């Protein structure tokens, strides 16, 4: 009552949706408008306290108002609105706000409690079968109303799936709410089980399978995966594996000897396996012709006696089983198949339609007959299978639309057997139990049990879909092998963290209980541990040809599919247990694998690869591959059912995600308080997904019934895996980055096992030939480090619980490292030696190889003189990898040091060498470990300096490095070490070459090859994608990391896979080389790995790769001739990487500017000219433009080495016009050219003269190069258009302008050889020429200027050029595009634009 008084409007709104009149719920005609209002209030409620939905929960409006409306509304719009509101109300609490933050206050905790109560009561309301049935029927109605679903209808279906997903996601662990029916039950009833049971009764499985395969599946693909994951949420994978193993065993025994299977299983296995077997009557009429001659009459009697006790559906099931054997005594499989069909069809309508039953069953039968008539007699079985499964979707008036699409789609891609077992949903597993207790005689009971077991077995066999029988026995044999590649491996998955190898032993024991010949001696010779249960079965089955066997199983699968006619309607009131749900899901698993799995994985994979804005949790994809691929391999389904999963593309994506998640995990681990659980879970799922992928390849390699296409596909896949260096290196990376403090031991075990399986595949693929094989010994060398072996030792510590296979993986690696590679020293670690001693003392059963290894290592250790303690790994190795320790010991920053750094920076800011001063200050205070680069990176990380300043400081480091490398007694180096005149002359990229020479000199050339390979691979991927090919030509593959980064338009990481590469990233010359080449360092990108910019073109990457050293043309994956031509035609793009190119650019950092007020604005123009020059012209040897310290110029995209389009040529016309019109006697045209082609630098302009000067006198007017035009523009800019006192005599002018011309003429006459000798004169002349520069508020003005006539002439020529070439813009705007000025500098001084020719 209090609630009603507090929220009368809310109560009024919900109560007016409808009311109960007698037994009928009447919907208010205005219900839709009320629902829209409720939805609006729900959407715009308080985003923190969520008061509206809390009020709904308090008023129990979900149960009292929304659910009745959902069950009784007939209007589609009302149903849609109700479902949308329910979806909103059942959203998990975590999606509404930050639970961690809300838990900190009492109000927040109370809010969370009330919202959880709302969710729990909502889930409780959906335990009623009518509520879920309304949602399922609504989906069926939408699908049947129109085969071509509109986007709106697709959205409606997605909302229904979202509602089911939200309901199943709600946890049941809250103690404050208990279902009333749960209190009276001894063990309690799971609401989850009840909802799942109801959904499967309502044929949700068929609906889901249809939605997975229909053309519009992209709309709900992600939601579907989430729903499937929640359906399997509480199902331990080992449970389903055991059930499928039993099923598989029964299948093998029945298909080999029918008579034997009638008697053997009950004798040997009824005690252990009958509960599961007898609850699984998946075959109503599949085996009766061959099995049931002797018991047909007894079954008829028994069935007749119980007609009143079982449901109508149960009657139909029993009668079908009893009738068919009598009708068909010849035992022919084909005959029983057809007869089973024919006898069921007339029987179903008569006996399966009770008065109170919903009409969809009767409609279903009518539709089925219509379908059969329409399809005709041809391929009757196959068509029926498809039709039956999809016709059950609902009481449609247009069933053809619903069934036609998927049937055609499936039949086009798979053979008829693939359409199989829609119907054996675990609905049937529970049919036999009801009649059994009321049977009169125990013998009849036993007969029924036997029959159920044998018939159950027959349909299991069908799932194998044409597998050749001889191999089936081999599959079971190899399960117990200690060879890692066989079936034993799945037991080491993440879900079995406490089971390990033991689970497989359990499986084998349960398998043996239902096998026919446990005592057969043939099983023991080869394999010691598990008995070879199935070996004897190979002999009888080999009598049939493989094709006959395949056909037999196809028939059985068709029949199994038809058993879906007997649904779970008779068990509506059944109370489901966990075992019931497990059996249910076992059946659905087979249907899902046969019908929807490949579609769902393919759809999700496509959405993950697309650059869609919708974020998708990748863990669902990993889970799909991990969880179901093991079942597909266990049942050895035909390759056509998993051909979209076992592809290079899927494995490539998993590899890329492994690298990406490794980096994300480390970045988050460095941030205090970040939640690592999602990253750890995804990381573990990636590893297990790769393991199941490789395990499936290995399993199918041993299957004998594959056709040639499947074998070729597997062979090709193995060759691609052997070429994929990223995959094999991924496990080196993950093992090195293993951290016991955050990772679980199960994750470590999965890493070791998966790596072992991969190595076996690599070893076997080397024998296939056809590709360049890798050298396994070189690869294994990467594991021969102290820390990796330390982690192997951690795993070996638990050798008693690991299981034989995991121990086998560990010992194999140690054997290779200690024996083949001879690096036994890395095994001399306490954790390994102690474990060896324990194994030795415990007499643990080991094969001879491992015993020899232990003995050899211990003996070698005892006889090897001890080394220094530093070589023994300490516990610090377990905290992080070696390079991480190095980084943190050498460059770790305490909070005090970080605070001190800013103070030191302020103190050093006016010093020429800022970083050197900071290093000195740290050193004075006792900290001698700070390197120059680490200080620069820390300055950037703390935002003390901008990216532009960081860029210039790094250039300064380049110069420092070059100075220390090249200092000679004759070189006049300044205090800051910036003397580049001699060394840079004639060598524009000299700094890169110097770094390369030093790296090679230090014997680190292999790291240059590593970097070169990455660049070449990126180049190859870009070329392939540019050509529009998804698959590269030839046998080459695109490496996963480069391919996916480029596809997603992300920068490509330079992954340091092994220890050597990580150490190289701490080697200063290599880091400087990366910086010089334009590769983003980790500090730049805020990441663990350095990165190659994604905007680089293939030509750029190829040019940089050539810089690193000669290319091995034989190993290139592409034709380099085009790229060779491109690099040869435009060398400048590889010699100039913007403002970071040359070491000489750093000379501006320590220049002492004389009169900054007088020259403040000149560097603006110079920086622009420098930028345009660097980007647009081919430089001559000494064209080195310096960057002034007062203006840190930088492009908007840092590091871009691409050339810009050439500068517009209108200035050439200006020069021609000027020379043609001049009347004064001031020299010949070469004067003008000389004056315009000279590049002069004073302070901000650098200290070199353009080489064009020496050629200017002989350059004709028609061959003016871009440098000339740029330089002329520079001078015109200085001299302005508002020159008042200049004469009109051509290049002649006033004293100032003539002094400039004279200066430049001198430079022209001096020639290139005297360039350096002119510098002092140039400096003096330039300074005097600018001494009279005055700044006012509007423009530059001089005492002596050019005349206005010249200005007007220039403007007119400019206008003509503008008319002639409309796309050319002014040079000013062109330079503006190429040059981005620094915002900070603009604020520091008043910027006065130079007027341009107006």
Curated annotation (Swiss-Prot):
Which ranges does the record mark as transmembrane? Answer: none
**Tell me, what is an example of a GO biological process annotation in this record?**
circadian behavior
Q: Where in the cell is it found?
A: Nucleus; Cytoplasm, Perinuclear region
Q: Sorted alphabetically, which InterPro entries does this protein's record hold?
A: Timeless (IPR044998), TIMELESS_C (IPR007725), Timeless_N (IPR006906)
Coiled coil: which residue ranges?
none
Reported function = Required for the production of circadian rhythms. The biological cycle depends on the rhythmic formation and nuclear localization of the TIM-PER complex. Light induces the degradation of TIM, which promotes elimination of PER. Nuclear activity of the heterodimer coordinatively regulates PER and TIM transcription through a negative feedback loop. Behaves as a negative element in circadian transcriptional loop. Does not appear to bind DNA, suggesting indirect transcriptional inhibition.
Q: What is this protein called?
A: Protein timeless
Instruction: Give the species.
Output: Drosophila melanogaster (Fruit fly)
């Amino acid at each position: 009552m209090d609630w009603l008084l507090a929220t009368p409007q809310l109560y009024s709104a919900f109560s007016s949706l409808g009311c109960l009149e007698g037994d009928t719920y009447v919907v208010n005609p205005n219900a839709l408008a009320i629902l829209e209002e409720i939805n609006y209030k729900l959407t715009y409620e308080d985003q923190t306290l969520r008061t509206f939905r809390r009020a709904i929960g308090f008023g129990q409006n979900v149960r009292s108002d929304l659910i009745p409306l959902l069950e009784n509304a007939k209007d589609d719009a009302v149903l849609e609105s109700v479902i949308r509101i329910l979806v909103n109300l059942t959203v998990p609490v975590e999606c509404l706000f930050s639970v961690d933050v809300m838990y900190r206050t009492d109000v927040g905790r109370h809010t969370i409690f009330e919202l959880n109560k709302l969710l729990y009561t909502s889930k409780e309301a959906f335990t009623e079968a009518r509520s879920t049935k309304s949602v399922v029927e609504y989906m069926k109605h939408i699908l049947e109303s129109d085969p071509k679903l509109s986007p709106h209808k697709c959205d409606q279906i997605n909302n229904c799936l979202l509602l089911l997903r939200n309901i199943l996601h709600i946890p049941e662990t809250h103690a404050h709410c208990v279902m009333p029916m749960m209190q009276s039950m001894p063990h309690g009833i799971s609401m989850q089980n009840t909802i799942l049971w109801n959904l499967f009764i309502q044929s949700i499985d068929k609906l889901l399978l249809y939605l997975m395969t229909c053309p519009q599946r992209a709309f709900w693909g992600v939601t579907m995966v989430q729903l499937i994951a929640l359906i399997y949420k509480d199902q331990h994978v080992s449970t389903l594996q055991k059930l499928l193993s039993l099923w598989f065993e029964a299948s093998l025994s029945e298909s080999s000897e029918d008579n034997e299977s009638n008697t053997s299983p009950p004798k040997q296995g009824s005690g252990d396996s009958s509960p599961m077997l007898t609850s699984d009557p998946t075959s109503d009429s599949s085996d009766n012709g061959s099995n049931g001659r002797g018991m047909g009459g007894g079954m008829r009697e028994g069935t007749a006696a119980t007609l009143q006790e079982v449901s109508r559906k149960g009657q139909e099931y029993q009668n079908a089983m009893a009738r068919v054997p009598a009708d068909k005594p010849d035992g022919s499989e084909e005959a029983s198949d057809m007869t089973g069909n024919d006898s069921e069809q007339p029987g179903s309508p008569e006996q399966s339609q009770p008065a109170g039953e919903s009409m969809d069953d009767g409609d279903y039968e009518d539709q089925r007959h219509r379908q059969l008539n329409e399809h005709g007699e041809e391929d009757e079985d196959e068509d029926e299978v498809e039709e039956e499964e999809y016709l059950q979707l609902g009481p449609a008036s247009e069933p053809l639309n619903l069934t036609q699409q998927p049937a055609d789609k499936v039949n086009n891609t798979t053979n008829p057997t693939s359409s199989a077992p829609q119907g054996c949903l675990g609905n049937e597993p529970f049919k036999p139990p009801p009649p059994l207790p009321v049977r009169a005689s125990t013998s009849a009971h036993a007969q029924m049990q036997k029959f159920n077991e044998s018939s159950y077995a027959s349909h299991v066999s069908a799932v194998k879909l044409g597998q050749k029988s001889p191999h089936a026995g081999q599959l079971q044999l190899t399960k117990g092998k200690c060879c890692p590649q066989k079936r034993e491996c799945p037991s080491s998955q993440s879900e079995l963290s406490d089971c390990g190898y033991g689970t497989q032993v359990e499986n084998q024991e349960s398998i043996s209980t239902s096998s026919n010949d446990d005592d057969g001696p043939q099983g023991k010779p080869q394999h010691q541990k598990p008995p070879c249960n199935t070996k004897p079965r190979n002999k009888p089955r080999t009598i049939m040809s493989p094709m006959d066997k395949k056909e037999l199983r196809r028939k059985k699968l068709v029949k199994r599919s038809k058993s879906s006619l007997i649904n779970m309607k008779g068990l509506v009131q059944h109370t489901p247990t966990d075992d019931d749900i497990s059996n249910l899901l076992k059946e659905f698993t087979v249907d899902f694998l046969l019908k929807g799995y490949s579609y769902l994985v393919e759809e999700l994979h496509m959405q993950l690869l697309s650059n869609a804005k919708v974020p998708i949790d990748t863990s669902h994809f990993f889970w799909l591959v991990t969880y179901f691929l093991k079942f597909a391999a266990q049942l050895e389904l035909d390759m056509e059912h998993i051909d979209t999963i076992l592809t290079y593309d899927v494995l490539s994506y998993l590899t890329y995600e492994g690298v990406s998640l490794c980096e994300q995990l480390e970045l988050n681990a460095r941030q205090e308080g970040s939640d690592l659980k999602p990253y750890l879970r995804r990381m573990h799922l990636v590893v297990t997904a790769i393991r199941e992928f490789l395990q499936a390849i290995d399993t199918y390699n041993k299957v004998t019934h594959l056709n040639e296409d499947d074998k070729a596909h597997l062979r090709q896949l193995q060759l691609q895996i052997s070429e994929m260096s990223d995959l094999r290196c991924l496990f080196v990376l993950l093992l090195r980055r293993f951290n016991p403090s955050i990772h679980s031991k199960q994750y470590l075990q999965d890493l070791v096992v998966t790596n072992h399986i991969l190595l076996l595949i690599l070893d076997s693929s080397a024998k296939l030939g056809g590709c360049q094989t890798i050298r396994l010994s070189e690869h294994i060398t990467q594991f021969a480090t102290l820390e990796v072996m330390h982690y192997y030792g951690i795993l070996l510590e638990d050798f008693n619980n690991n299981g034989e296979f995991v121990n086998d993986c560990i010992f194999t690696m140690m054997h290779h490292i200690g024996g083949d590679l001879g690096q036994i020293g890395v095994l001399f670690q306490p954790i390994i030696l102690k474990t060896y001693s324990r194994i030795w003392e415990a007499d643990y059963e080991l094969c001879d190889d491992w015993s020899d290894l232990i003995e050899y290592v211990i003996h070698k250790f005892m006889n090897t003189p001890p080394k220094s303690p530093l070589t023994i790994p300490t516990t610090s190795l377990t905290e992080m990898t070696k390079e991480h320790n190095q980084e943190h010991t050498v460059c770790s920053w305490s909070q005090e040091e970080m605070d001190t750094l800013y103070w030191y920076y302020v103190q050093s800011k006016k010093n020429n060498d800022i970083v050197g001063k900071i290093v000195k200050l740290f050193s004075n205070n006792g900290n001698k470990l700070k390197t120059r680069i680490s200080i620069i990176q820390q300055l950037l990380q703390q935002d003390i300096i901008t990216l532009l300043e960081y860029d210039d400081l790094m250039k300064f480091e380049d110069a420092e490095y070059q100075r220390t490398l090249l200092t000679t007694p004759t070189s006049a180096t300044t205090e800051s070490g910036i003397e580049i005149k001699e060394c840079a002359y004639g060598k524009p990229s000299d700094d890169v070459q110097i770094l390369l020479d030093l790296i090679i000199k230090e014997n680190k050339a292999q790291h240059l090859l590593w970097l070169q390979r990455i660049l070449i691979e990126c180049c190859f991927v870009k070329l392939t994608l540019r050509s529009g090919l998804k698959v590269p030509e030839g046998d080459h593959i695109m490496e996963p990391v480069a391919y996916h980064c480029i596809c997603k338009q992300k920068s490509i990481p330079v992954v340091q896979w092994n220890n050597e590469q990580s150490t190289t990233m701490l080697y200063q010359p290599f880091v400087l080389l990366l910086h010089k080449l334009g590769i983003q360092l980790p500090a730049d990108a805020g990441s663990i790995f350095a990165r190659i910019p994604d905007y680089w073109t293939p030509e750029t990457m190829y040019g940089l790769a050539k810089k690193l050293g000669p290319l091995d043309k034989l190993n290139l994956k592409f034709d380099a001739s085009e790229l060779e031509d491109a690099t040869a035609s435009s060398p400048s793009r590889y010699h100039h990487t913007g403002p970071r190119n040359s070491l000489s650019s750093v000379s501006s950092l320590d220049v002492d500017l004389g009169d900054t007020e007088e020259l403040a604005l000149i560097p603006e123009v110079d920086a622009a000219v420098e930028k345009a020059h660097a980007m647009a012209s081919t430089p001559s040897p000494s064209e080195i433009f310096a960057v002034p310290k007062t203006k840190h110029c930088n492009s908007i995209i840092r590091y871009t080495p691409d050339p810009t389009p050439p500068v517009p040529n209108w200035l050439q016309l200006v020069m021609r016009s000027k020379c043609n019109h001049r009347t004064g006697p001031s020299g010949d045209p070469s004067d003008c050219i000389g004056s315009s082609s000279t590049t002069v630098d004073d302070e901000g302009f650098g200290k070199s003269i353009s080489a064009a000067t020496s050629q200017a006198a002989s350059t004709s007017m028609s061959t003016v190069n871009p440098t000339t035009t740029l330089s002329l523009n520079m001078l015109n800019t200085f001299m302005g258009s508002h020159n008042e006192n200049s004469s009109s005599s051509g290049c002649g002018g006033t004293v100032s302008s003539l002094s400039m011309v004279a200066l430049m003429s001198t430079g022209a006459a001096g020639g290139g050889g005297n360039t350096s000798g002119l510098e002092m004169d140039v400096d003096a002349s330039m300074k005097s020429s600018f001494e009279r520069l005055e700044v006012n508020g509007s423009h530059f003005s001089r005492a002596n200027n050019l005349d206005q006539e010249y200005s007007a002439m220039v403007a007119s020529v400019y206008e003509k050029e503008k008319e002639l070439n409309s796309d050319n813009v002014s040079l000013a705007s062109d330079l503006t595009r190429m040059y981005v000025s620094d915002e900070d500098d603009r604020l520091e001084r008043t910027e006065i634009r130079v007027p341009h020719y107006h």
